[in-house]
């Protein structure tokens, strides 16, 4: 489990660097609200972007984005709503997923913009 946690932290660090390199202003990482967590919150072009980061090893059977199921989406949206209210943010919100596959020489990164929308309640 420790190896998996280390890889996850390394993946989040790589995802953050990737976003900064591509013009995102990262506001917070690992922001907690109750038992929920937002991996990365950033702003780009007057839009608040909530980024879920998924890191996997090369030999993992499922693709990283498949781990973002309906339950996970609801938690991310609830935490994002709390974030917007807490910081009194008046920007449109976009939900992205950054996937990282660990290779021998580093990470293969895929950035999925508008990966999902907030479900209707």
Curated annotation (Swiss-Prot):
InterPro entries: Restrct_endonuc-II-like, tRNA_endonuc-like_dom_sf, UPF0102_YraN-like
Sample GO molecular function, one term: nucleic acid binding
Gene3D superfamilies named among the record's database cross-references: 3.40.1350.10
CDD domains assigned: PoNe_Nuclease
Signal peptide start and end residues: none
Pfam families per record: UPF0102
Homology family: Belongs to the UPF0102 family.
This protein's name: UPF0102 protein BDI_2565
Origin organism lineage: Bacteria, Pseudomonadati, Bacteroidota, Bacteroidia, Bacteroidales
